[in-house]
Amino acid sequence: MTTKDEYRANRRADRRARRLKEYRHGLRPFAIAAWEISKEHNVGTLVRTAHAAAATEVILTGEREWNVPAARTADLYTEIVQLDADVAAFRAHLRHRGWSLVVVELADDSVNIFDAVYPERPCFLLGAELGGVPPELVAEAELVVQIPQWGLVPCLNLAVAGSLVVYDHLAKRHRVGGLSRPDGGLVGGRIPAFGNPDG
């Protein structure tokens, strides 16, 4: 690589680091976790949601392959942690990062998301399309929530469910003044240049 190429590469890296810092500025830390998802497009969509909502990380357990094109480069800015589908390893990661477990699951004691009061550092765990979340994680979660559904088939797409819960959390943070940029940075229908609020 030439000196000119190195200079450009360093400038790009510096710009990316600056944009990443600005991108996360003022938003509360939270994570999205997926337990053994079998449909790759769902993972890609969750990564895009995590990026749009400025999640600190996405935790994937089990399956290592996922639909990178569905993420639309959001994976460049969102940390993706891959773990084995091991309950002990997952618990250890939550403790290490200081996350409070919030399971998204249809269960008898689930709280409707409309009534949910989320903990300060939630990690929203979604279960596999077939099988759901391991029962021991449901039992020890700080909160178990479900999304109200009025249709005859009580089953939302996993990525859609994750998006709904994340944005319910952000809406509640906004109501108490927890978001520095509640408009998501949109000005006049466009995203301004980072570091220049006027675009």
PLM segments and residue spans:
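Post-transcriptional modification and biogenesis factors for structured RNAs
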Residues: 1-199
